[in-house]
Amino acid sequence: MEILRATTTAGRAGAYYVRIQAMARKHQIPLDVEFDEHDTPDTKYIVAVDNYLPIATCRLYAIDDAKVMLGRIVVLPEYRHQGIGTLVVKEAETWARELGFTTSVVESRDNKIPFYESMGYVADMEQKIEGETFTCFRMEKNL
């Protein structure tokens, strides 16, 4: 298994594949909701691949000069609970630091908060985000 920075069309296609399989299909999320205004040519993606097949992803985009949003973090169901999500997030954080960001932000579903807390993120339970599909809470970590 490899954790890659998706800097090519093929890499981005891998990120999109994982999101379609694990989110759009599973939760019946329309593509124009899953792929939103933050999926731009400047958006960065991390992709985990196993035997050349994409199995996990994360996207990164700037909130401002100091903060980066890590989002659409997803691992295909058959690969969950093997530490792959942690590896993907850690690579995204490394890339964000290299790009000059000092704070990482995630918007986590409530049942995933312990996952992010295990990596040093702190939840702000006052910042509840009612999305079209899920209710999430903002979490931050100093990079």
Labelled PLM ranges:
Residues 117-126:
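Conserved acetyl-CoA-binding loop of GNAT-fold acetyltransferases
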Residues 89, 96-109:
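Conserved GNAT acetyl-CoA-binding A-motif
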Residues 62-71, 80-81, 130-135:
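A conserved beta-turn-beta hairpin within the catalytic core of GNAT-like acetyltransferases
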Residues 32-38, 126-129:
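Short, solvent-exposed loop/turn elements at beta->coil junctions and helix N-caps
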Residues 47, 53-61, 69-74:
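Conserved beta-strand in the GNAT
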Residues 109-110, 129-143:
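C-terminal "cap" of GNAT-fold acetyltransferases
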